[in-house]
Amino acid sequence: MFPFYSLFLIYHFVQHVYKGIDILIKNYNIDEVAIEELFFNKNVKTAITVAQARGVIMLACTHNNKPIYEYTPLQVKQGVVGYGRAQKMQVQQMVTSLLKLKEIPKPDDTADALAIAVCHAHANRLEKTLKNFK
């Protein structure tokens, strides 16, 4: 019975993530999607769950014809703080400052997502500027 229960949970997990992303894309008229490349060195179970969610997110974006951009943690830190080895708190403080927030976003995943968005905005602006020089 356990394998069927496990498949049932995965089915609902995938369905929930897909529908949620699909709704966000449609309700907020999202043009592009930026995600962080996976990096896990400790908890394999967490890595698998995050990888599954990430795949579903990418599928939902693809079905909605939204380009997906990936950034490494080093690129995110470089794009937000200007230093690829910045500490998490430095990144959070810079995100708070750049977005004119009253306090550091919580939980940490929210702050990370905003940092990825800021990184992408900077990278996108640079890419457009470089295209204008051609």
Regions found by a protein language model. Give the residues of each.
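Phosphate- and other anionic-substrate recognition elements at nucleic-acid/protein interfaces
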Residues: 1-134
